[in-house]
């Protein structure tokens, strides 16, 4: 399965929500990264046919864009999925099957996939936040789509539920394209094969986590500063971590200039997020 996106653009009045996006995606998990307003939801909504692009093309192997077959290829989990909370899990999926003309025999198998089979007779309003999110994924995958899109699926979940969700998506990813939009970049650690960075509707970068770390490590420095000088460094540089050491602090920061400080031995995905979006949060 392949998605070919060429020169994709979308405007809202005079504002560019997406600005000439070109990507080629094959099977695997992708993290779609960016702060609020970066264009992530618009991008996913265009991909699954909810809204129309203004220019550019989308090709999906042999499937014609927006044809009847196209809608069977995609599963979509929006940021705020509509769940009928007075229904049981089983009743809700029966409704989804009727809506999509899918055999109801798929329900038990799908509930087992998302680890909700034991809750099939429980009303949705009694489920935890993590269970509701897994049920949202169940309704999106019940027809076994080849492409699964998830918009901020980990928002509001505790660390245990986030880990369960990551494991579920990893198990679902064989021979599928899964795109997960998030501003919590650490959720993509050891999950996404590549990260797609959006900012103001533009594509900033598209690399594997390992490639990103190798290419950006040169911009990160570390040093030890006194408590008295700490604020000066925070105001001068984009500081990504502060660790107390006795009466001093070990700080990590990035700079596009050649600094006289030692380079960091290690950086992580949170450092990379700050590298791309530190200026966005400085303005808030």
What are these regions (language model features)?
Residues 48:
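Helix-to-loop junction immediately C-terminal to a conserved catalytic motif
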Residues 56-70:
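Conserved ABC transporter NBD signature motif
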Residues 94, 98, 104-120:
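Conserved ABC ATPase "signature" region
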Residues 167-252:
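ABC transporter nucleotide-binding domain
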Residues 148-152, 157:
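Catalytic Walker B motif of ABC-type/P-loop ATPase nucleotide-binding domains
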């Amino acid at each position: 399965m392949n998605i070919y996106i060429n020169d994709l653009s979308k405007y809202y009045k005079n504002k560019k929500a997406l600005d000439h996006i070109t990507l080629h995606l094959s099977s695997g998990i992708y993290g779609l990264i960016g702060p609020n307003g970066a264009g992530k939801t618009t991008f996913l909504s265009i991909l699954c046919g909810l809204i129309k692009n203004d220019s550019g093309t989308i090709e999906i192997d042999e499937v014609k864009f927006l044809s009847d077959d196209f809608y069977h290829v995609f599963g979509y989990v929006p940021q705020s999925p509509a769940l009928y909370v007075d229904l049981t899990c089983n009743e809700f999926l029966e409704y989804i099957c009727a809506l999509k003309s899918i055999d109801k025999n798929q329900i038990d198998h799908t509930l087992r996939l998302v680890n909700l089979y034991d809750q099939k007779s429980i009303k949705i309003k009694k489920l935890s936040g993590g269970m509701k999110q897994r049920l949202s994924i169940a309704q999106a995958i019940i027809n076994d789509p080849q492409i699964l899109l998830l918009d901020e699926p980990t928002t509001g979940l505790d660390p245990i539920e986030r880990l369960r969700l990551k494991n579920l998506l990893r198990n679902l990813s064989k021979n599928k394209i899964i795109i997960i939009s998030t501003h919590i970049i650490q959720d993509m650690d050891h999950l996404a094969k590549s990260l797609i960075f959006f900012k103001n509707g533009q594509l900033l970068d598209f690399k594997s986590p390992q490639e990103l770390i190798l290419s950006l490590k040169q911009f990160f420095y570390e040093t030890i500063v006194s408590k008295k000088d700490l604020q000066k460094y925070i105001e001068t540089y984009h500081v990504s971590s502060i660790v107390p050491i006795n009466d001093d602090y070990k700080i990590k920061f990035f700079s596009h200039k050649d600094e006289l400080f030692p380079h960091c031995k290690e950086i992580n995905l949170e450092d990379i997020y700050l590298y791309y979006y530190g200026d966005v949060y400085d303005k808030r």
